[in-house]
Amino acid sequence: MVATPSTSSQTKGVVRQVIGPVLDVEFPAGKLPKILNALRIEAKNPAGQDIALTAEVQQLLGDHRVRAVAMSGTDGLVRGMEAIDTGAPISVPVGEATLGRIFNVLGEPVDEQGPVNTKDTAPIHRAAPKLTDLETKPKVFETGIKVIDLLAPYRQGGKVGLFGGAGVGKTVLIQELINNIAKEHGGVSVFGGVGERTREGNDLYEEFKESGVINADDLTQSKVALCFGQMNEPPGARMRVGLSALTMAEHFRDVNKQDVLLFVDNIFRFVQAGSEVSALLGRMPSAVGYQPTLGTDVGELQERITSTLEGSITSIQAVYVPADDLTDPAPATTFAHLDATTVLARALAAKGIYPAVDPLDSTSTMLQPSVVGDEHYKTARAVQSTLQRYKELQDIIAILGLDELSEEDRLTVDRARKIEKFLSQPFFVAEIFTGMSGKYVKLEDTIAGFNMILSGELDDLPEQAFYLVGNIDEVKAKAEKIKSEK
């Protein structure tokens, strides 16, 4: 959706050059559009087919010309076509009507569900909130997922990097977070699909419908809005779709005063698209061929994702690391903005531990006594040191067996296995697949449960009782059930 001002204020230009997704447009003297304004081209191509294209002004060239980047394919565009300056940046629909719908970078619905029932729109380019409007006190964002809340807690209004290969449970974890924020925090979510596969976007949409995150019968009951700019789209669309999703999230934060979850999959593709556009505009490449404006491009997006006094946007960003090189400028620049990292491990998924969050690799700046309190901090560190010791002993166990360990080490292994099992839990969104009802575990229950395992109070309970349960009361009930079945 693009702002369309009154006819009297419209300035008309003429397309003078088209090179791939980049076009040069000439305007009358003194009437050049501003940088970031949207240009609209509506015409018929030589074959008689309709063209409706939006482009964003990126450079002023001199000689009354501007250079713009197209948001869709430029096939059929010819020199001499009329381009209209809309007088404003690209705008997208915002508000409750966006929930349950799929949009493209321009805010046009692409789910064949008809037009969006709202007149509220907002420009995708805006300044980050003022420092005086920010919520500066760090506050933990409770997710109800034990392993995250205990070992790598999220910051409300913070940014989390989600690392994981294919098939380790990224999508299910994302769905559970969307479900939990809706039920426990009364919040909504926005999903920005940036430069990923169309098939994955379609699968995600179908899974959201299946798990109830999107209510196909009554869209007003849905908990998420989706905004996609996929791999096959021009770099302009992939570069801006993250901002379109963020704009929808900002409305829920600033106008509805809600806590919002913003998912970006994948933040690397946003950088990659910026690099392509930079090259098309003729800018000199910087380190490893990336755009010279890499830092500001990422910063402009990330600085808008924050907590204000009215509400918060907590962002979870999938991060692709090219060739597993963490020093690559794209992931390295992203890391500077992250408050926490959630790493999904294939080895845990293979053991059937879901969510497969790696308790030793996942980190958070929130895990410090001054923020989470002494009890939480000490429990988390004790859990990690127990698991680390178990990891060190695994080679010895594989070669010599458990019997060769000292009494103390055997006890450590026993407790570590219980901790590993207790870090798993059944998800609400997976109920239809597992047949087990989902669990939301309060932070105090999580801390109390792990303290009981570490102190040895539960040494006599079987390991299996700790697997896929919520709090410690369920462990005891499951242990009784196992005992009665023997």
From Swiss-Prot:
Q: Sorted alphabetically, which InterPro entries does this protein's record hold?
A: AAA+_ATPase, ATP-synt_VA_C, ATP_synth_F1_bsu, ATPase_a/bsu_AS, ATPase_alpha/beta_chains, ATPase_F1/V1/A1_a/bsu_N, ATPase_F1/V1/A1_a/bsu_N_sf, ATPase_F1/V1/A1_a/bsu_nucl-bd
Sorted alphabetically, the keyword list is:
ATP synthesis, ATP-binding, CF(1), Hydrogen ion transport, Ion transport, Membrane, Nucleotide-binding, Thylakoid, Translocase, Transport
Annotated GO molecular function terms are: ATP binding; ATP hydrolysis activity; proton-transporting ATP synthase activity, rotational mechanism
Question: Catalyses which reaction?
Answer: ATP + H2O + 4 H(+)(in) = ADP + phosphate + 5 H(+)(out)
Please name the Gene3D superfamilies in this protein's record.
Answer: 2.40.10.170, Bovine Mitochondrial F1-atpase, Atp Synthase Beta Chain, Chain D, domain 3 (1.10.1140.10), P-loop containing nucleotide triphosphate hydrolases (3.40.50.300)
Coiled-coil blocks: none
Main location per the UniProt record: membrane
Determine if Membrane is one of this entry's keywords. yes
Compartment(s): Cellular thylakoid membrane
Which residues of this UniProt protein bind ATP? G164, G165, A166, G167, V168, G169, K170, T171
Q: Which domain of life is it from?
A: Bacteria
Report membrane topology. Peripheral membrane protein
Reply yes or no: does the keyword Translocase apply: yes
In terms of HAMAP family, this protein maps to: ATP_synth_beta_bact
Q: What's the family? A: Belongs to the ATPase alpha/beta chains family.
Q: What does this protein do?
A: Produces ATP from ADP in the presence of a proton gradient across the membrane. The catalytic sites are hosted primarily by the beta subunits.
Q: Subunit info?
A: F-type ATPases have 2 components, CF(1) - the catalytic core - and CF(0) - the membrane proton channel. CF(1) has five subunits: alpha(3), beta(3), gamma(1), delta(1), epsilon(1). CF(0) has four main subunits: a(1), b(1), b'(1) and c(9-12).
Please report the name of this protein according to its UniProt entry.
Answer: ATP synthase subunit beta
Source organism per UniProt: Prochlorococcus marinus (strain MIT 9301)
